[in-house]
Each structure stands twice: as C-alpha cells, then as structure tokens.
UniProtKB/Swiss-Prot annotation:
Record-linked InterPro entries: C1q_dom, Collagen, Collagen/C1q_domain, Tumour_necrosis_fac-like_dom
SMART domains reported for this sequence: C1Q
Lineage of origin: Eukaryota, Metazoa, Chordata, Craniata, Vertebrata
Signal peptide: 1-34
Keywords, sorted A to Z: Collagen, Glycoprotein, Secreted, Signal
The protein's name in its UniProt record: Protein HP-25 homolog 1
Source organism of this protein record: Bos taurus
Length: 212
C-alpha cells in the first residue's frame, strides 16, 4: 500500500540519521583518545622573551594637593649699625654787631652738643667732613646790618637790610661741602658806629646733612 511504504521510508531515514550521529560521536571520541596518547609530559619553562617597545606617554595627571607647610627657618644674624656722625650748632646774639671783617661772637649758645662751634671766637670748626647747611636769621629795629657768610676767609654770600620804626627780617642760608679743618663764621660788613644803632637780634646755625 502506498501509505505503508511512506511510513517505512520515513523510519528508514530516521534510523539512518541516528546511525550517522552515533558514528560521528564515536569517531570524535577515538580521535580525542589518540590525541591524548600522543601528548608527552610538560617541558621546562623557556627563557624570557625580549622586552616590548615602550608604549606612548600617558595623559598628564591632575595637580596634587598642596604640601605641608615647612618648618620656620633659623633667625638671621643681628648686626648693630654704626652710629651716624653728627655735627650741629645754634647760637644767638642780642645787641650790636662788632666791627667789620671779624667773626661775630654770639652771646648765647642754643645748641652745641658736639662742641664743633667755638663760642669764644664765633667760628665753626669742621670735624666731620661732609655736606652742611648754614643759615642766619636777623631781626632789626631802627638799625641796619650787612653780614657775610665766610668759609676759610672767603665770602660765600652776604645780606644787607635796613629797618626804620618797624621790625624787619633778614635771613640767608647756604649748603657747603666741607673738609676736616675747614672754618665757617658770620661777620659784619658795616663799621661799628652803624652797627650800634637801633636794636638787633641774630641767630646763626649750621648742621651736617650728609657725612662723607
């Protein structure tokens, strides 16, 4: 019968397929056993290979945290500065000036701590070489004056003033560079008779600006 033949054919094909799968599995097991029998024992470790080439530089990492504050350093050496040289004076006169061409001798010493001004002669003697400032201030009433600022007998500057029935002022100053032993003074340029008229008050002073 045709239907019976189809079922027999299908059963034959299925049986063949199962038989083929069994054969393949058997062959695989045999091959695996043969490979296992061919492998020998593990050999010794070989020498290390050559180093590989260096890789490219990596990316820059983030900035690290600030470090701890270091210990304070040792204190520095303390040195004493030498004292600066000093030289100054201030003197005052109330009354007539002496005759001409001689130093004016002042009656009152306002300042002369270094002793560089000689009150007896009216002369400043330079003991500290350097740059000095000298000046004078004169107040007049019914009188006339003419004075010269002198250095070693040479006039540096002069000043003339007259006053009637009112008070007048006359002043002058100069900056001089002196060497040790130089002498500075203020002297009158009028005769004594002219100087004795009226009332005169004068202050003469000087001080060191910068020592050499």
């Amino acid at each position: 019968m045709p239907g019976g033949r189809r079922r027999v054919g299908s059963m034959n094909i299925a049986g063949f397929w199962i038989l083929a799968q069994f054969v393949l599995l058997l062959v695989a097991n045999v091959k695996s056993s043969a490979d296992s029998e061919l492998c020998g024992p593990r050999g010794a470790r070989g020498p290390p290979g050559l180093s590989g080439l260096p890789g490219p530089p990596g990316y820059t990492g983030p900035i690290g945290m600030p470090g701890l504050t270091g210990r304070p350093g040792l204190p520095g050496l303390v040195e004493k500065c030498p004292p600066l040289p000093q030289s100054a004076f201030s003197v005052k006169l109330s009354g007539p000036f002496p005759g001409p061409s001689q130093p004016i001798v002042f009656q009152e010493v306002l300042y002369n701590h270094q002793g560089h001004f000689d009150p007896a002669t009216g002369v400043f003697n330079c003991s500290v070489p350097g740059v000095y400032h000298f000046g004078f201030d004169i107040e007049l009433f019914q009188s006339a004056v003419k004075v010269g600022l002198m250095r070693n007998g040479i006039q540096i500057r002069d000043k003339r003033a007259e006053a009637g029935d009112s008070h007048e002022q006359a002043s002058g100053s100069s900056v001089l560079e002196l060497e040790k032993g130089d002498r500075v003074w203020l002297e009158s340029k009028l005769d004594r008779e002219e100087s004795e008229k009226g009332t005169t008050h004068a202050v003469f002073y000087g001080f060191l600006l910068n020592g050499n």
